[in-house]
Amino acid sequence: MGDETARRLIDASEAGDWRTIRDVLSTVEDPDDFTFYVHRAAFVDGVENWVDEWVEAEPRSSLPLLVKGAGAIHWAWQARGSGRASTVGSEAFKVFFRRLKIAESCLEEVTERDRDGAAGWAFRVILGRARQLGIDETRRRFEEVRKRHPWHVEAHEHMLQQLCPKWGGSHEQMHRFALETLEAMPPGSPLGQLVPAAHLEHWLDLPSGEDAEYIGSDEVTAQLFEAANRSVLHPAYVRRPRWPTLHNSFAMAFCWSGELVAAAQQFDVIGDLVTEWPWQYAGNTVAVFQDYRRRAYEVVGR
């Protein structure tokens, strides 16, 4: 992962040490960093076993409710699994939706208590999609995040997911959102990553043969380079927590599009900090990453 703060939060969560989680999160001021670190603390197996102790100990604080609500989203996905809806049994869906309601209840209270906070609304964007509340409701929640932090990274990522065909959107809506964000975002913003993310989602939906033709097209390749130049390759770009995910997504998209020289540049930045997403789309995360890194480095003579 390469992030000592994230590692500390995960270790504390696994140990049920909510005091350490509270102390660490209380020092994080940037809204994107804060949401990222809440995610790291909450998306750990077993949070539901200790978080109520924290809620009871600090009933006036919204932070334990935020962690409980975010943790309940992870808990719900544990019941559902990561496959498409057609692979999920009816009993698993019942547990999934029941746990999502717990998350919604907690996060609704968070957004009522902390009127200026973006994180509660950001996690409610996830819930809009997971609870199948529809694009309009998820977008309403997304706009609540934007009122508080216009370029919130996780909120944009989850809004993009809502616009994917598998969640009720379309390729057209998904790409439009990614490209409009790219056009409007500040120079060097990590949100340029929405463009490769959208193309990888589109690639995943296509049958063999069509997928390679699509992602290797001149139009897609041009958009990938434009997105990289406006974000991770821009002089204003600054690495912040979760930066490996951005570079891994560009690396995979460049690999799939046949632009191995550009991919090698991303692998140089990544080092060994492989992230599960998006490489798991193509099989074993580490094996696929290492294979394509080797191919990219062979092209540049390493």
Regions found by a protein language model. Name each.
Residues 207-249, 255-256, 261-262:
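Intrinsically disordered, low-complexity segments enriched in Gly and acidic/Ser/Thr residues
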Residues 246-282:
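C-terminal structured domain segments
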Residues 1-24:
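Compositionally biased, long intrinsically disordered regions
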Residues 27-58, 70-187, 192-225, 270-273, ...:
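Short coil/linker segments at helix-helix boundaries
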Residues 8-12, 38-42, 129-130, 238-240:
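A short, ordered amphipathic alpha-helix with a cationic face
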